[in-house]
A protein has these predicted regions:
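Alpha-helical transmembrane segments and their helix-helix packing motifs
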Residues: 11, 15, 104-107, 200-203, ...
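Domain-scale recognition of functional cores that engage charged ligands
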Residues: 1-244, 248-261, 281, 305
Length: 423
């Protein structure tokens, strides 16, 4: 299974795409549990053992029992790992190799393993624990970026050149008190790439990530890579995943590459079988409530359209005494006071109150609230929804985007909006 942080993570789309492409089950923390020293997946058919866990969750958030900084995770996971009952891809602690300190020793590491000199030089890095490096950093503080020597969470780099004199003195005091905890790296001028930023093309700094595959036969550098871009270079210095957007890097070739598909890597007939009971129980529950809220939103939209059409045909008097208005109130689409004699006179007229109710957050059972639930639930089911379904939900969200009070639609615009949604 592929263990993701969930729809709130900026990497969730990549996690869902990866799981769907490879045919693996995408799970969140609530889908997993430890029973009898075995990692289990909660499904409709009961608990199923998990043998391989592809971890996409930070180390410190994996096990709240043993990792005291964890606010989530699967209780007992580390004990299962020590017992050898589960294999974890992207093993715990592998984040250590992203520590800036290793850049100091990369040339010597390559020499030790007889790999030859580095083909690409590393960014000049100085460890403040070394006396000569410490004095050089102190003398050139305005030319470097200060980072923690060991990667501990997403700690932002420090830029002495942008600090006040007092802030710079405080930083020097921190480095002097714990020199082994800091490294300094030379500031570099990053290349830029064109980025479409909403309504125009801008040049943003980029950070390029390459990938190397290791096997028994050696290592192979993959063509292309991944670029992270941001509107200012400082946003790219924090970690390999920092930045605001991702861009694929393609190498232009002279001939078409052969098609590859992980799903069709094996030949032979496909055996069809029903496996509904292996569906994670969280997914089944989310699908149930997704369907319920889609039905509720559609019912509210159709009922509201009938009411707006009566207003559009100048039949407000008929609407006030009709069952349509009562049905809207009883289903939570409008304020109940609109049908209470003696109170509706104190409220805005129907021509303004009905269109406003479409975008109201104050109605728990209203159209906007139901649509919010649809968007939230579908985000957690991204790996199981078709592309067409996802486009429809995105279109609904875009059409019904929240608006300021001064920009609310009138009766005609609201009717047209509901026509587009229902059709």
């Amino acid at each position: 299974v592929v263990w993701t942080k969930g729809p709130g993570s900026r990497s969730f789309f990549e996690d869902a795409y990866l799981a769907r492409y490879l045919g693996y089950t995408l799970v969140q923390t609530d889908d997993l549990a430890v029973r009898n020293n075995q990692l289990m997946l909660k499904t409709l058919g009961g608990l199923l053992p998990v043998d391989v866990l592809w971890r996409r969750v930070n180390d410190e958030n994996c096990d709240p029992v043993e990792l005291h900084s964890s606010t989530g995770g699967v209780a007992g996971l580390l004990e299962v790992l020590r017992s050898g009952n589960v294999a974890i891809v992207n093993g715990l602690g592998s984040r250590l190799v992203e520590s800036p300190l290793l850049a100091v020793w990369l040339p010597k590491i390559a020499e030790y393993f007889s790999l030859g000199p580095l083909q690409l030089p590393t960014k000049p890095t100085w460890w403040c624990s070394d006396e000569n490096s410490f004095h050089w950093v102190m003398a050139h503080l305005h030319e470097v970026v200060i980072l923690p020597a060991f990667r501990m969470g997403n700690v932002a780099p420090l830029y002495p050149a942008d600090m006040s004199q007092a802030e710079k003195q405080a930083l020097v005091h921190r480095i002097r008190s714990q020199p082994a905890a800091f490294v300094a790296q030379q500031k570099i001028e990053r290349s830029t790439t064109p980025v479409w930023n909403g309504d125009q093309v801008k040049h943003w700094p980029l950070a390029l990530r390459g990938f190397v595959l290791g096997s028994e036969g050696g290592h192979r550098t993959l063509q292309g890579g991944l670029a992270r871009v941001a509107w200012k270079p400082q946003l790219l210095d924090q970690s390999p995943t920092s930045g605001e957007k991702s861009q694929d890097v393609w190498i232009q070739g002279h001939r078409s590459a052969p098609p590859t598909d992980a799903a069709s890597s094996t030949a032979g007939p496909i055996t069809l079988k029903r496996s509904g009971t292996e569906l994670p129980s969280r997914v089944a529950d989310s699908f149930f409530w997704l369907g319920r809220n889609i039905e509720r939103a559609e019912f509210g939209a159709r009922l509201m359209r009938i009411a707006l059409q009566l207003l559009l045909n100048e039949r407000e008097g008929i609407l006030e005494g009709s069952r349509v208005l009562r049905a809207l109130a009883e289903s939570g689409q409008i304020e109940p006071d609109l049908i209470v004699p003696g109170m509706k006179e104190t409220l805005p007229v129907l021509t303004s109150s009905l269109p406003r109710s479409l975008f109201s957050d104050d109605l728990p059972m209203g159209f906007r609230s139901s649509l919010d639930h649809v968007i939230r639930l579908s985000a957690g089911l991204r790996d199981r929804l078709s592309t067409d379904s996802w486009r429809i939900i995105n279109r609904m969200d875009a059409l019904c985007a929240r608006r300021p009070a001064s920009d609310l639609p009138d009766v005609a615009d609201a009717t047209e909006l509901l026509d587009m949604l229902i059709s």
